[in-house]
Amino acid sequence: GGWLITHLGDEDGGVYKLNLNGDLIPYLLEVNGQLLPPTNYVHIDNLGRVWVTVSTRLIPRILGCKPNFKDGFIILIDEEKPRIVAENLGFTNECLIHPVTGDLYVNETFSRCLSKFNVSSKGHLLNKTTVMEFGTGEFPDGFAFDIEGGVWVTCVVSNKIIRISSNGQKEIIINDSDVSHVNYVEEAY
């Protein structure tokens, strides 16, 4: 038993296994012969495949926090060797496999969108579509699916929780925004 966790360091990254006894063991430190930069998120789907996101290759990561800069990527670890299955993403954040459709959803924080890919039987990501584009101050971070087919998204900066219904309707569930902070970030963005 144990957990897979990511290392979101200042300069290095990777995925580690944290055993129940507290031992920390490297799980994935490189892909395609390159050391992983700070690594954002890891998800194990119901088929045992491991999906890993890297927000940006830039160090420090803050350099990747731009609206039109897209160097984030997704790694798949399955029975084949670990490999990059999607690139050119706008600050790749949390990703999850939808429990019913099997599609992979991913937040692109600084592109301000939630994207979706179809997943082939070999783990290839196909037919990227935008599920939702977010507005002022809404930088999507984490998310979860609900039993009605909706997606609940947390937004950093604006401190919002947004629900996207299965038919694409956006509903703000919680809005705890600090307008001056949102304006400051929007100016810098």
What are the roles of these predicted feature ranges?
Residues R112-C113, M132-I172:
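Loop/turn-rich, solvent-exposed surfaces of beta-rich toroidal or solenoidal domains
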Residues F117-H124:
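Short loop/turn segments immediately following beta-strands, especially the blade-tip
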Residues Y16-G22, F69-E79:
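Beta-propeller blade signature
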Residues N19, L63-G64, D78, N118, ...:
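Structural recognition of the beta-propeller blade-terminating site
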Residues L24-N32, K81-E87, N127-E133, K170-I174:
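A short beta-strand motif characteristic of beta-propeller blades
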Residues L8-G13, I59-D71, T109-R112, V156-V157:
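Short, solvent-exposed loop/turn segments at conserved positions within beta-propeller repeat blades
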